Swiss-Prot record:
It comes from Oryza sativa subsp. japonica (Rice). Belongs to the dUTPase family. It catalyses: dUTP + H2O = dUMP + diphosphate + H(+). Binds 1 Mg(2+) per trimer. Keywords: Hydrolase, Magnesium, Metal-binding, Nucleotide metabolism. The keyword Disulfide bond does not apply. It comes from the Eukaryota. Its cofactor is Mg(2+). This is Deoxyuridine 5'-triphosphate nucleotidohydrolase. One of its GO terms (molecular function) is dUTP diphosphatase activity. Pathway: Pyrimidine metabolism; dUMP biosynthesis; dUMP from dCTP (dUTP route): step 2/2. Homotrimer. The lineage of its organism: Eukaryota, Viridiplantae, Streptophyta, Embryophyta, Tracheophyta. Its EC number is 3.6.1.23. Mg(2+) binds at E143.
């Protein structure tokens, strides 16, 4: 068994630990292209509000009034080719939800859909909500999707949670 007589081994180990480590090389990933077709002059291409924003803003292509306590379909006049292996989730914009009680419904765009994209807006307030062409009305988030095969089984694997739902893990 070898031992260090003057501490050189431990000094070398400490120096190695404090040495500047090169970051692992990142493999450049080529992002898939989001192909978008404008169907009218009022259509606005989806855009992200910042470099790290998850969602692409979707804008109205028409004047629409969402009635108080009601809903309306707002056209974007866009057709979008969602990349294979993903889908687009159409989600509310936080500012519209907070300031005007505007929410989004039924927001899934499948990768094989090529028709015009419309956004269903729900107005949870007591006043009508006016939408003008160019207004940002929702955000579109591209998400990876897993589509497993369906298999009918006699029993499911047991879990600690079991059949508890609807608040069973706490409120």
């Amino acid at each position: 068994m070898a031992t260090a007589t003057n501490g050189n081994a431990s000094a070398a180990a400490a120096a190695a630990d404090s040495a500047v480590q090169e970051p692992p090389h990142k493999i450049a990933k080529v992002a898939p292209l989001l192909k978008v077709k404008k169907l009218s002059e009022n259509a606005v291409l989806p855009s992200r509000g910042s470099a790290l924003a998850a969602g692409y803003d979707l804008s109205s292509a028409a004047e629409v009034v969402v009635p108080a306590r009601g809903k309306a379909m707002v056209p974007t006049d866009l057709s979008i080719a969602i990349p294979e292996g993903t889908y687009a989730r159409v989600a509310p914009r936080s500012g519209l939800a907070l300031k005007h009680s505007i929410d989004v419904g039924a927001g899934v765009i499948d990768a094989d859909y090529r028709g015009p994209v419309g956004v269903i807006l729900f107005n949870h307030s007591d006043t009508d909500f006016a939408v003008k062409p160019g207004d940002r009305i929702a955000q579109m988030i591209i998400e990876v999707i897993v589509t497993p095969e369906v298999a009918e089984v006699e029993d499911l694997d047991a879990t600690v949670r079991g059949e508890g739902g609807f608040g069973s893990t706490g409120v």
